[in-house]
């Protein structure tokens, strides 16, 4: 307990008082490289605390990290009332070739409308259509 007391009462205040924080805006431009290096650790600590607070209290961050969103589900909107989405397409009905969606983002189900391009940009995925040729 004495080590924690020593850290809070003397070590941390001495460290913070010795940081090269300038009094004026122009003083920031006069800092040396060594001074900038000395400011990196407390900046990282403050940024980490801020980011942790953001994840803990921001609703958008909570939604993004929740298990609901990251459940591994592919289909979020097409024919949700069915237990399994199956489409039968007769090869005889295909003129020359047809592109079928695999990303579940299309508005023209089951045909691909290129929605996977935006999906790939947002997620870093590389999904594309299934192309069937006659």
Curated annotation (Swiss-Prot):
GO terms for biological process: regulation of autophagy. Its cofactor is [2Fe-2S] cluster. GO terms for molecular function: 2 iron, 2 sulfur cluster binding; metal ion binding. It is a single-pass membrane protein. One of its GO terms (cellular component) is endoplasmic reticulum membrane. Residues 1-35 are lumenal. This is CDGSH iron-sulfur domain-containing protein 2 homolog. It comes from Drosophila willistoni.
């Amino acid at each position: 307990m004495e080590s924690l007391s020593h850290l809070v009462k003397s070590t941390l205040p001495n460290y913070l008082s010795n940081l090269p924080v300038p009094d004026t805006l122009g003083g920031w431009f006069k800092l040396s490289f060594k001074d900038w290096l000395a400011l990196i650790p407390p900046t990282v600590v403050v940024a980490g605390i801020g980011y942790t607070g953001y994840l803990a209290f921001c609703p958008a961050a909570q939604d993004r990290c929740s298990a609901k969103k990251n459940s591994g589900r592919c289909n979020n909107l097409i024919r949700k009332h069915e237990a399994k989405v199956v489409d039968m397409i007769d090869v005889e009905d295909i003129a020359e070739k047809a592109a079928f969606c695999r990303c579940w983002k299309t508005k023209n189900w089951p045909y691909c409308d290129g929605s996977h391009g935006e999906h790939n940009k947002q997620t870093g995925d590389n999904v594309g259509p299934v192309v069937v040729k006659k």
